[in-house]
Amino acid sequence: MSITFNAIDHSYDSINTEGIDWISVTTLVSYFKKPFDAKKVAEKVSKNKKSKWYGILPDEIQNIWNAESTRATTLGTYYHNQRESDLCALASIEREGFTIPIFSPLPEKDGIKYASIQKLEPGVYPEHMVYLKSVGICGQSDLVEIVNGKVNIIDYKTNKEIKTESYTDWEGKSDKLSPPLDNLDDCNFNHYALQLSIYMYIILKHNPKLKPGKIFIHHISFEQEDVDKWGYPIAKLNYNNEPIVKEVIPIAVPYLVDEVISIMHYLHDNKHKVKKK
């Protein structure tokens, strides 16, 4: 069995006729986050005299936010593609004292990516697609390493910042993810930790002889030429008109296996709710 990924609409589908209604890991994690009502927030900040958005039409504010989101996504896509290209140009690489092969993802056909075999041997797997048929979830890990009997996962993030705590109100109450994850702050570090932990869980399900290794976020920042009138960065470009990487900061991420198991149980009984949302 295998699945495909359509990069245009970010959808997953089965190659065969099993008709599984797939849910992406990012969609699954987002289900437990506090919803962000962009329209409502834009209307609120446009009326706040202390806000930089004061006096600006809410629709214009949302357009500015969307443009910034597109800018950040474009940078992220550039870095992902560059890393994949660099790694796939090599036959092997040294990791933890071992020389291991690099397995390129299957070639795209008409914009469609195909999942490779889920049973993994020692090596490096850029842009590795994972799926778990029993619960109908799938996703794509930026980098998976199988070395010395362990699974290492690395994910590239180009966000402005990685927040390890959520918003706390004047009473000292912080925003939490919804049950059964209400022990975790609703912040992007925990969102990513859950995402990568689910990838780890799926890989180990297909490869029970392997053990969990290290999980890292590589937080990427780029050289800035300037900032725009709203304070958003303008990337500095090299002679090839490409953004210049300033720094790559590795951030260790815990394997949240207990939380992942809770998600699997929840999904088994509530998949229709997750899809509906």
Protein language model features and the residues they cover:
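A structural signal for short, well-ordered beta-strand segments and their strand-loop junctions
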Residues: 125, 152-156, 214-219
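Metal-dependent nuclease catalytic cores that hydrolyze phosphodiester bonds in DNA/RNA
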Residues: 1-138
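Short, solvent-exposed loop/turn segments at secondary-structure junctions
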Residues: 131, 159-161, 206, 222-223
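Short alpha-helical patches at coil-to-helix transitions and adjacent helical residues
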Residues: 72, 76, 162-165, 192-196
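Metal-dependent nuclease catalytic regions and adjoining charged, substrate-binding loops involved
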Residues: 185-193, 197-277
